[in-house]
């Protein structure tokens, strides 16, 4: 059984991909996990490629880069086209069905839900993190603590996170990260 989980969150500048990665990484750290979070983004303030990579482990992390992708969370079609070729048949692919035309994976209407609930797409990242949190088995309270501490509009971001958590909970049995099971194949 693997004791390490590798997560990639990908989208475009302006979607809050980096912030989502930081929130998720800090929440895992609050659970006592070893965590490495790296990020990459284009020079454009909005619209360029953006990604956050998170490695979570019970053991020490000896290399800060992803060796494989266990979970790929994609918020934009261009990011899907860029990062989907790097996954294998065991990678969990979760995507924003509002913006991504995916070949396989589990789609959720993150952006549509954000617009419907808040009148703006700006909370889609926290809705997506909520769904991913449910799938990973991360304690939602830990994520909410980080959101309250680090995010502007904390109340709305917590609400968005909870909406996403319920979306994710409805379709999966949570996995406890300290006892990660072999990922299931989404098709």
UniProtKB/Swiss-Prot annotation:
GO terms for molecular function: 2-oxoglutarate synthase activity. Its EC number is 1.2.7.3. Pfam families: POR (PF01558). It is an enzyme of class 1 (oxidoreductase). Keywords: Oxidoreductase. It catalyses: 2 oxidized [2Fe-2S]-[ferredoxin] + 2-oxoglutarate + CoA = succinyl-CoA + 2 reduced [2Fe-2S]-[ferredoxin] + CO2 + H(+). It comes from the Archaea. Heterotetramer of the KorA, KorB, KorC and KorD subunits. This is 2-oxoglutarate synthase subunit KorC. It comes from Archaeoglobus fulgidus (strain ATCC 49558 / DSM 4304 / JCM 9628 / NBRC 100126 / VC-16).
């Amino acid at each position: 059984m693997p004791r390490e989980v590798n997560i990639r969150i990908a989208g475009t500048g302006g979607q809050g991909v980096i912030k989502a990665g930081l929130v998720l990484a800090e929440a895992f750290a609050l659970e006592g996990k070893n965590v490495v979070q790296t990020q990459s983004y284009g020079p454009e303030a909005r619209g360029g490629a953006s990604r956050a990579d998170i490695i979570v482990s019970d053991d020490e992390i000896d290399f800060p880069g992803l060796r494989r992708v266990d979970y790929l969370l994609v918020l934009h079609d261009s990011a899907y086209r860029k990062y989907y070729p790097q996954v294998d048949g065991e990678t969990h692919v979760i995507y924003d069905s509002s913006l991504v035309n995916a070949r396989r994976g589990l789609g959720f209407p993150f952006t549509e839900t954000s617009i419907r609930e808040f009148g703006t797409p700006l909370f889609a990242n926290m809705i997506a993190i909520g769904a991913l949190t449910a799938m990973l088995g991360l304690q939602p309270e830990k994520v909410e603590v980080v959101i309250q501490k680090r995010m502007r509009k904390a109340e709305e971001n917590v609400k968005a996170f909870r909406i996403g958590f319920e979306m994710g909970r409805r379709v999966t049995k949570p996995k406890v990260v300290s006892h990660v099971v072999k990922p299931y194949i989404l098709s």
